Amino acid sequence: MKEEASEHGGSADETQELSPVSDSSDEMPNNAKRRRRSQSMIANKRIHQAFQEDEGDEDWEEEEHKPKAKRRYNTRSNESFSEGDDEPFEVSESSALEDELSDSEDSFIRSVRSKPKYKPGTRRSTRLRNRRSQDEEESEEEHRPILRERTSRINYSVPLAFPPVDEMDGDPSSQVNQSRSRKTHSELAITKLLRQQVSSFMPYIDSSGSESESDNTRIKKSSAKTIKALTDPANSGGPPDFGRIREKSDLADSDPLGVDSSLSFESVGGLDNYINQLKEMVMLPLLYPEIFQRFNMQPPRGVLFHGPPGTGKTLMARALAAACSSENKKVSFYMRKGADCLSKWVGEAERQLRLLFEEAKSTQPSIIFFDEIDGLAPVRSSKQEQIHASIVSTLLALMDGMESRGQVIIIGATNRPDAVDPALRRPGRFDREFYFPLPDRDARKKIIEIHTRNWDPPVPEWLCSMLAEKSKGYGGADLRALCTEAALNSIKRTYPQLYRSTKRLQIDPKTIKVKVKDFVMSMKRMIPSSERSSISPSKPLSPELKPLLNEAFQDIEKTLQKLMPVASKLNPLEEVMYDDPKENDFEYQQRLETFETLRIYKPRFLICGRKGLGQTALGPAILQQYEGVHVQSFDMSTLLQDSTQSIETSIIHLFLEVRRHTPSIIYIPDIDNWLNVLPLTAITTFSSMLERLDFSDQILFLALSSSPLSELHPQLREWFSSKQSVYSLQYPTRDSIIAFFQPILELIKASPTELPGGIPRKRRVLPELPLAPDPPPFTSQKITLKQTKQADMRLLNKLKIKLNALLGSLRARYRKFKKPLIDFNDIYCVDPETGHSYRSREECHYEFVDDVVKQIGSDQKFSMMSLEEIEKRTWDNCYCTPKQFVHDIKLILRDALQLEDSETIKRAQEMYANVLLGVEDMEDDQFSQRCERMALREAERRKLRHGKLQKHLDETKADMQFTSEKPSVDESITEVDDAIKDGPPVLAETLTNSLMEDVGPENVDMDIEDNEIFTNQSTMSVPSMLVENEESPKPDEYIDQKDKVQSPLLNGKSPVGVPSEAALRVSTDVSTNISSNGRADIPVDTLITSPADVPNNAPTDAHNITSADGHIENIEQEVVFPDLVFDEDRLTPLKQLLIDSTTGFTVDQLLHLHSFLYQIIWNTKSEWNRNSVVDECERAVKEFMINALQ
């Protein structure tokens, strides 16, 4: 605008005033803004000059007491008031302001000089100019008085919440009397007084010695890190952890798991082959690395466990970790589940896996066990999310990538191997795959023996064999649950009173014995895990059917042995135990293998016959004999159970399972209906898959048909073309029918006393068991007390960190209270040794009299509390609760109120309010309650410890008066006594420990009072007094020494929460062995002084605990039974009737008649006239025959 105006021969103002046309609405605002800027520049110049003049007139003392951030640079003297102030930004800011003002001034002067001589303008322009000048003068007059009243410029920078960690305590502006080289008498006396005040509430947590000093130093360093992180400008915004780089341990839980040392391979039954293979994977490379170096190879480093649930996959991994971690060798064990590595953040799961493998490498040899690995590494597909594919790819690369993972063994466990990505199931990643089937008979017997080997009395071997026979289909977890339920049943049978009382009764556990009935009851209620999803097709032949089907069963079994012989395979370790003369002959080894396979040709077998001849019982019985062979049922329920896939797809999947687990059996229970219901495509698919099997494959095709041989389906004739592959069932013979009904005839002539339930059972009369005393703590008291102390120390450290953070903000904002409000030089104090004082009483305003600082001429007392003293008490473990911290802050406020300085009172009240707000923010309900309970425990420990120590000191002084052989002991006692009275409790605790180890006659442990405190606080514990010593006194000595051992607090009146002497004596009777160091028990007779000390319900004799037989009192009364009425000749016609009428019956019809007769015998089991039972059976047979013929 200026250049444009100069081109027309004048300035913009001249153009405005000369030309009325130029005074338009568009040009007026621009001119006004320009004038306003020029006038403001002049005003700013004046303000700056006035500010500089005020800065030069400031007093030195006022400048010294100002904070660093408020002191400014003196422009007149060109010097800084404090050379140590690190504020270069303020100087540069001031200089930049001056340069800006000078530049604006020069431009304004040039613009004024370039203007021509002023010419009078129009009336309107003059009126506007006068109005602007008046407004500027008014605005200048408004701001000028306020600006002139300011003594310093305002610091607009945001203050730090906490002071810097490296802030020097030697700042001359924040310390008073720093120039003194040594402390005065008043300062020494007041410091000693404050230390004595600390001893009234200082906790007795071990804080002396090198360990406590290192702990405090470590806590201070961690607190400094916390404060520094909070005061870091980079963390000023965002979440609390924004910008923080986490440590490696925070990113993944890479700590190895603790291994159960009691677990070993002996705890795993029926998996000896897999145990040997795992040993050669882990043990051999550690013990014999030269073997693998000789062949320049790496041992297998990955194995996949798969099988049904509850078959011991996780147990095997735990046993491997325990077996490898012995005394000579240590193997780290890491266990991860699928969800442990997953995260909602992108890439975090992959990072967790990488850190896990890195940690395993650093601690190799190590084992990583992935439980349920199908959830971590599922099959990758196009429909799957990308995150899962990335995790699988990362796991594949870590297991077998460019870098070798060293001696890191990977174990995966799953019950769905088809859901695991196929890339994992190759050598290099998972070198081996172990299939954990359901245990066979021998394995079940071994598992039962493992779970019952610690029972007293042990389970007999015949019972273990019987249980193994009856528990077909049970897994390892099911057998463990079976033994647990049997033990619980024995408890119910022996002591049913326990389930009727809510209180603890007195019993003898040795009387509880597990019997056969307990196992039978357990098997009735249990459902094996293998039968929860599907019913097992195998079932043994019942004893009732053996007379009818035993002959056919043996014939079928012999035929199947020829069709598909299943020889017991030896594992490699058992194979090498036998000599092989042709170990290097390849043809011989190949011929040996062909002998085993070429003798098999398409093993197929069909059981046919009329319906009801026992096909449904023979099929499961045959499968029962092939224990350990994979059985795959192709019945209709299996093919149609998955509605999402077709029948053909189900058939293909089932055939894949059959071929994967050889030897195996394809089982179809009702093949006639199967062929009639299935579509032609499904039958064709099955036939095609069946024909694709190799002729020597050990895959048996077993089918059951309800049609006779002459009426078989054409498809069946095609599949079972050989006569050897078909067995036709026949009707039962006469001899088999006689053997079938013979048990019924024996039951008819039996008396009611021989029949189960024939005579009503007597109801047991259960005696009332006495109440048992309160049990001792379930864990060692010494261990529990140690854990309590550690928990208190952790809680105290947490409180110290919070209080230190609050103190940091107080130190930065309230530096006036860093030292006591009263100067030590202003206190009159006389040295007790010399009787002199540094200053006279007339020169001082305060005096130190009777351990109190008073104002001369008044009764006002001062606590001399300061922030430095509070900080020292914080790190000396003096504050157990935040209330104690607030109490000392309140002392500072009280001193400020007594000084009657308005500024000091205001600052003290502000500090006290901030402390109350900070304490309220830092604590919650649980934290406050925990701190209060910790303070009570510490006070009780201090009271009991001081009492016991004082008691021992008094006894030692009394003994030393009669003996002069050990004069050094008296000196030590005097020193200890003085230390207790004057020194802090930490020193007293240290001296107490040393004295009680050397001087105490009974060597009483200093943890006795902790034991008593724990006993008082525990509701389930019995009050007891523990005398822990390596050499315990004899019973006779204990009577003489008991007065010395007991605490003085227990004499006379017992304080609240401390057990009395009578309670201690009774507790010794109740708990016969509480000592944790294995010393001899104290006899009961030496402790009980009067019958009143023993509670009424506490037994004093071990014989009061009766056995199980003594608990159950059966009413032994002579019961007269009536005479048995039975005619042997009446039984012959019934037998002949059964044989004649049932000839030509099928097996199902015979079973029906059999159950009908059993019902009659059950209803007449209490009948002593057995002839009437024969009549009812004859009548039932005739009625059954009439119904069967109809």
From Swiss-Prot:
One of its GO terms (biological process) is nucleosome assembly. Its main location: nucleus. Disruption phenotype: Abnormal nucleosome distribution. Decreases level of clr4 at the subtelomeric and pericentromeric regions and at DSR (determinant of selective removal) islands containing meiotic genes; decreases di- and tri-methylation of histone H3 'Lys-9' at these regions. Abnormal heterochromatin formation at the pericentromeric outer and inner repeat regions, the subtelomeric region, and the silenced mating-type locus. Impairs centromere function; leads to abnormal mitotic and meiotic chromosome segregation and sensitivity to thiabendazole (spindle poison). Changing E385A: Severely impairs histone deposition activity. Residues 52-62, 82-106 have a biased composition (Acidic residues). The keyword Electron transport does not apply. GO terms for molecular function: ATP binding; ATP hydrolysis activity; ATP-dependent H3-H4 histone complex chaperone activity; chromatin binding; histone binding. It catalyses: ATP + H2O = ADP + phosphate + H(+). Coiled coil: none annotated. Its EC number is 3.6.1.-. It is an enzyme of class 3 (hydrolase). Residues 794-922 form the Bromo domain. Changing E372Q: Severely decreases ATPase activity and impairs histone deposition activity. This is ATPase histone chaperone abo1. It comes from Schizosaccharomyces pombe (strain 972 / ATCC 24843). The gene is abo1.
